[in-house]
Amino acid sequence: MEFDAVLLLSFGGPEGPEQVRPFLENVTRGRGVPPERLDAVAEHYMHFGGVSPINGINRALVTELRAEVGLPVYFGNRNWEPYVEDTVMAMRDNGVKRAAVFATSAWSGYSGCTQYVEDIARARRAAGPDAPELVKLRSYFDHPLFVEMFADAIAAAAATVPKGARLVFTAHSIPVAADRRCGPGLYSRQVAYAASLVAAAAGYDDYDLAWQSRSGPPQVPWLEPDVADHLEMLRAGGVKAVIVCPIGFVADHIEVVWDLDAELRAQAQDAGIALARAATPNADRRFARLARGLIEELRSGGEPARVGGPDSVSGCLAGVNGEPCRPPHCAARETAPQGA
């Protein structure tokens, strides 16, 4: 399978104070999120001048992708400019016939995979009958470069805190019911498996997995433990240093720079705990190499590059033109709002 372009497909984020509320309304449309909740989340963005880091990171990643794949690289978002519909129309007008779609999510499940599939289908409808063929690349939570980037980030973070720091992986929480529908437990098992691979690569036999950034009614159970509660448990157990690795995020979303770098760090300081946050891949050149590798798998028909290990978990394979991915285990809708 040959390609004449690449589409980097992401979540989107505001780039000025006046964009914050419209962006959040896009993210939460149809979910019945009360206005006061939007106001609270908007304040998180205002701490950064109303600018999410995600679009700048993705533009830098586009530059790295162009250098790696040697093809035109386009950039489109679900929830803010550049909208994926506009990007795909531009691809059509430029004569693109088939593009590989690299989504900024390593996971399966509705939020991690199916929403991006829906984005592709919606964008192709907007572009009409001459829309390019769009092939979404497979999930990559167990790709060797994914594991390597996070393992190296943990090593760098460990150098900034006392020896013996406790390693804690985090990922975005989702409702327990949603996690059960998609597998069952597909997303949480993928995260746990990826954490085990990264921990082993970083030289850790013992570590923790916690969840972050939950929302919704308190009576609805979400994946636990919450990272803030887990940090309190570590404090009570006498832990004095922690390395937090946000393995669920391939870039610095607002959940990383606010929920971890601001709120969790403040909690750690109050508790007398030294906290280091491991970097996300962002625009690391290896992330672009990872994407190139996924494209080469489709070109050559070769075996996928995966880090093997006990308790391995299946992921989504490539999907074409917004058709459901294979295996078909991402159809159930989750309700977890993600940030950017």
UniProtKB/Swiss-Prot annotation:
One GO biological process this protein is involved in is:
heme biosynthetic process
- EC number(s) per entry: 4.99.1.9
Under the cellular component aspect of Gene Ontology, which terms does the record hold?
cytoplasm
Coiled coil ranges: none
Q: Which CDD domains match?
A: Ferrochelatase_C (cd00419), Ferrochelatase_N (cd03411)
- Does Metal-binding appear among the keywords? yes
Q: In which pathway does it act?
A: Porphyrin-containing compound metabolism; protoheme biosynthesis
UniProt KW Ubl conjugation keyword = no
Q: Where in the cell is it found?
A: Cytoplasm
Q: Which GO terms describe its molecular function?
A: ferrochelatase activity; metal ion binding
Listed binding positions for Fe-coproporphyrin III are 52, 116
Q: Name one Pfam family in it.
A: Ferrochelatase
Q: Which UniProt keywords apply?
A: Cytoplasm, Heme biosynthesis, Iron, Lyase, Metal-binding, Porphyrin biosynthesis
Q: Where does Fe(2+) bind?
A: 172, 255
Q: Tell me which PROSITE patterns the record gives.
A: FERROCHELATASE (PS00534)
Specify the domain of life of the species encoding this protein: Bacteria
Family designation: Belongs to the ferrochelatase family.
Q: Which HAMAP family match?
A: Ferrochelatase
Role description: Involved in coproporphyrin-dependent heme b biosynthesis. Catalyzes the insertion of ferrous iron into coproporphyrin III to form Fe-coproporphyrin III.
Protein name per UniProt: Coproporphyrin III ferrochelatase
The scientific name of the source species is Mycobacterium ulcerans (strain Agy99)
Organism classification: Bacteria, Bacillati, Actinomycetota, Actinomycetes, Mycobacteriales
Q: Which gene encodes it?
A: cpfC
